[in-house]
């Protein structure tokens, strides 16, 4: 119902995007509206909606919250790529590169002393605590580490939120104009070997050249491809939706599940499990 109302015209979408982005914690809805309009009409016709979403988000930036504006811009970029190229994998790689550039430019670096935020991160994540302890023992500056970790985590959150907004926008578009199209498209998401090679090169280059954000976010497209693989297999097998609930519960709460999904996405790039499964069925 909401998507149908938004698609009645650009003024409706612009009003919805502006209102959603203005309300605290509803920036994701404004970003999804901007993405939906971009997917449907293209970047130039969608500019009024993008501006309507960006103005309140810019105000939030002036108040110290960069996440809404970064999310609106990032999801719009990915929507443009997805509309033009019709490949989720390319949109994800483009989004990861853009988010890495934002981190490298210091957009997500918090002002002032970051040590208190770093201590909160350490208390909330034993993995981060061990990693930082190891780096500190090697002589790295705590303040620099704090800024890198906090900006990196913020950039990761923005990237994942933007991917979620793009998925929401694509599902709206499919629901209005191509029922079932989003499910089919997402279930088929898989990185091509050349795209995997690009991610590997970017990750290695990031480590060698000291561009940490490339190494920090380069794995995200592979993670989404692994998630799509799980969705696709469950769909092909006609399994109960509770399997997806259990899968996401494990994905959110346990690091080993993330590593397994990454490995599955990596192997699927070469083996194409869904094509083999479809033939066997």
Where are the language model's segments positioned?
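Hydrophobic transmembrane alpha-helices
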Residues: 1-52, 238
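Hydrophobic core segments of alpha-helical transmembrane domains in multi-pass membrane proteins
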Residues: 29-35, 68-76, 212-223, 259-269
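Central hydrophobic cores of alpha-helical transmembrane segments
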Residues: 47-56, 91-100, 240-251
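Short helix-perturbing small/polar motifs within transmembrane alpha-helices
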Residues: 57-61, 68-110
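Membrane-interface interhelical loops and short interface/amphipathic helices
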Residues: 104-149
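Transmembrane alpha-helical segments in integral membrane proteins
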Residues: 154-178
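Small-residue-rich helix-loop
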Residues: 175-229
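Long, positively charged, glycine-interspersed low-complexity recognition regions
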Residues: 216-281
């Amino acid at each position: 119902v909401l998507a149908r109302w938004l698609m009645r015209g650009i003024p409706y979408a612009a009003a919805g995007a502006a209102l959603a982005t203005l309300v605290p914690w509803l920036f994701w809805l404004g970003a999804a509206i901007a993405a939906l309009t971009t997917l449907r009409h293209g970047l130039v016709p969608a500019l009024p909606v993008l501006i309507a979403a960006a103005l309140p988000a810019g105000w939030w930036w002036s108040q110290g919250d960069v996440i809404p504006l970064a999310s609106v811009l990032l999801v719009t970029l990915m929507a443009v790529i997805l509309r033009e190229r019709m490949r989720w994998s390319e949109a994800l790689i483009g989004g990861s590169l853009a988010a890495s550039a934002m981190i490298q430019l210091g957009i997500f670096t918090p002002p002032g002393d970051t040590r208190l935020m770093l201590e909160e991160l350490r208390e909330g994540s034993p993995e981060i605590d061990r990693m930082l302890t190891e780096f500190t023992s090697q002589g790295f500056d705590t303040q620099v580490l704090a800024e890198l970790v906090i900006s990196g985590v913020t950039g990761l959150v923005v990237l994942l939120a933007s991917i979620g907004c793009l998925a929401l926008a694509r599902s709206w578009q499919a629901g209005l104009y191509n029922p079932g199209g989003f499910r089919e498209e997402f279930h088929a998401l898989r990185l091509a070997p050349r795209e995997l090679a690009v991610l590997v090169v970017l990750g290695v280059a990031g480590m060698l050249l000291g561009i940490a954000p490339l190494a920090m976010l380069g794995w995200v497209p592979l993670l989404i491809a692994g998630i799509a693989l799980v969705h696709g297999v469950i769909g092909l097998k006609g399994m109960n939706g509770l399997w997806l609930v259990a899968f996401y519960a494990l994905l959110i709460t346990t690091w080993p599940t993330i590593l397994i999904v990454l490995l599955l996405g990596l192997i699927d790039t070469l083996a194409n499990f869904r094509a083999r499964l479809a033939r066997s069925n």
